[in-house]
Swiss-Prot record:
GO terms for biological process: DNA-templated transcription. The gene is rpoZ. Promotes RNA polymerase assembly. Latches the N- and C-terminal regions of the beta' subunit thereby facilitating its interaction with the beta and alpha subunits. It catalyses: RNA(n) + a ribonucleoside 5'-triphosphate = RNA(n+1) + diphosphate. It comes from the Bacteria. The lineage of its organism: Bacteria, Pseudomonadati, Thermodesulfobacteriota, Desulfuromonadia, Geobacterales. This is DNA-directed RNA polymerase subunit omega. GO terms for cellular component: DNA-directed RNA polymerase complex. GO terms for molecular function: DNA binding; DNA-directed RNA polymerase activity. Its EC number is 2.7.7.6. The RNAP catalytic core consists of 2 alpha, 1 beta, 1 beta' and 1 omega subunit. When a sigma factor is associated with the core the holoenzyme is formed, which can initiate transcription.
Length: 69
């Protein structure tokens, strides 16, 4: 499989800081036993798997608004 880059992921996630949060949350899920959403025949590390999932559009996000007090 081709090398995944941050630019590939930024096509799916507009903000690089949001990308870091999304990838780290997905890595935690994978470490806790979640199944990869893509083929991982090369036994890549969870960080690479999470970035490939984001770049392929398998992992997304939803922004929620906070209520002001």
């Amino acid at each position: 499989m081709a090398r995944v880059t941050v630019e590939d992921c930024l096509e799916k996630v507009d903000n690089r800081f949001l990308l870091v949060m999304l990838a780290s949350k997905r890595v935690k899920q994978l470490y806790k036993g979640a199944s990869p959403l893509i083929d991982n025949k090369a036994a890549n590390k969870n960080v690479v798997v999470s970035l490939r999932e984001i770049a392929s559009g398998k992992v997304g996000y939803e922004l929620t608004s906070r209520k002001a007090k």
